[in-house]
């Protein structure tokens, strides 16, 4: 246990001695030094600079993911405290945590946007941590954070187990190695073993139980309470002092200890699980350990656990109670011991798969065998009231230096870097360089004009303008952009006066720059501006920021469901030819999955409404043989712009934006002197509108968003809740299951059978008497109702659910997809839209 001054005593020894933990090793550049010579100062400056060049194998880029209220921010706060990053522990309820610094976060007690912070832990490991939101409305924050992470800490609530949002983010992080922390073990009803079984079955993973909960009575009359953990790897009992977060006792477990048999069982399960795939461990176990589970050294076990974690064969599981300061140090040890460094993490998805990419201990990644090539991804843009626009990036290869000229391969624009910053939540530290694996910030007056979320930055590691030396294929490198989920709610936004329109547009531009999952649609004919988002809370927060943070002179309308239209048949092929040599021929039709296979080339997504553009190749010209002054990329982007605007004009039934359409440009011709996109815009957009206008109204159908809904209720409330769902809310009930009863989960495929068997065979300690007492008191577990429900019927559902269940019910919903509205629902939809 490197995080405390450890002199172990055996389990049966007395008296009990608490050991005060040492938070974080003191770095050289933090030392206080008296009078020194000029030579010493030079040496000190060199060592300070050198100390910042972190060994890439000792870097961990991690995120904390979980369902809302599982304890992500509370756990983050304890990590920062025990690492020595902060001197006082903040509280979510008091609104003074480090990573929740937005006014809306502090007033509501929830995380709204991801926050990055760096700290050191044990043996000079650098941990770059991103705390992510748990609410489904802010899922885009999770998606873009996951793109730049190498490992994850998944937190489960020991009472609630695996919840709906947990399953969702687990799938989103499918390719990322994880450790799991079962939190809130101090709460009445906490069930460690039940939570582990749900983890195995619902998330389809094997587990490695690194520690198990320890309960003890604090006095003779009290019920047992959660006090610490049994460490199966190190063979210790770790007990935390409830009165002092800085005190912990560590006791070696010998054969005389009451917990020895539990330790042996946990060790046996750990070694057996690892031995299924780790030949090195099997050889050691049968050889030097003589088949004795207790003789396998900690170092050998740790190496095997690390191999299993990196290969994603299994997930290490730990437990604790972050609010009570229990179990956080072992979790931090697991982060640095088992999660990957940037030199071991998954490779980023690159557009050019012909260029070789490999891990490199110095460079992070070696792309095209070019040690001077720096590659970075912009994953977030924010605006600081003092520093202005700030672009968060992850460096994948090479070194990014301030003052160097870089190339945005997503836009084809060169620009000079201003300041580079390392962020510690909302506190900035100016730095000169970002190294492989670093998560940092580009700052400067014009940086937001040059870089957006999802852009790829290419730079030379040593030369200020070295990008000139790169090959064309290297400059064209792009990391796969960040996918943006489709919005399902909308609200009208209008300026308070006509003179406020410019200020409104500027505020909306800034807001969508920071949050691309907000989609702004402007109707040029009516002048109406509509803001689209992921949910009611998402739009509520956006409106709050517009009014209170940006001081925008606007009025925001009532939040409403975002409906779409689609076409049921293809349009006629339309052709347009101009006197100056522009010629286009196209049609619009309904999208189907086969289109992507048929048109593997020239296939471009059009925003987030499942619309696509297909451009057939010209027999005379292509991207490699392009004679026009206008760049090929600008040619394509101009057509994309035309398509998006034309489709947003909407269909004939209700004027809702069009969804699931393909615009197929079959033939095209440009004059050889084509240098600007204006003529393309003037030709293509009216052509698309003409094609759509030629269809009769009957060729259009209204689409409405359908949601995956999970409602958790007690048995006595089940009937009224189901009746309300199937009657008033037009729900399609999929299943009704016992809450937490993992063994009754639907077994529909071979994988699920496999993980049911694994859960049955997994060694688990019996759950605490506190958990059993809760079950006995209630006499029953809850029920989970799973259903597909039109989003229109779920608006303000929480109020109805509280009334039906006397406040005992809860629900979670996520977007499933768009579905054609039945004829009996169309009238209600049109009425809601005031049409």
From Swiss-Prot:
Provide the protein name: Ribosome-releasing factor 2, mitochondrial
A GO CC term attached to the entry:
mitochondrion
Q: Which GO terms describe its molecular function?
A: GTP binding; GTPase activity
Q: List keywords of the entry alphabetically.
A: GTP-binding, Mitochondrion, Nucleotide-binding, Protein biosynthesis, Transit peptide
Q: Which Gene3D superfamilies match?
A: 3.30.70.240, Elongation Factor G (Translational Gtpase), domain 3 (3.30.70.870), P-loop containing nucleotide triphosphate hydrolases (3.40.50.300), Translation factors (2.40.30.10)
Biological process according to GO = mitochondrial genome maintenance; mitochondrial translation; regulation of mitochondrial membrane potential; ribosome disassembly
Tell me its family. Answer: Belongs to the TRAFAC class translation factor GTPase superfamily. Classic translation factor GTPase family. EF-G/EF-2 subfamily.
Q: Does the keyword RNA-binding apply?
A: no
The record lists the lineage as:
Eukaryota, Fungi, Dikarya, Ascomycota, Saccharomycotina
Q: Where in the cell is it found?
A: Mitochondrion
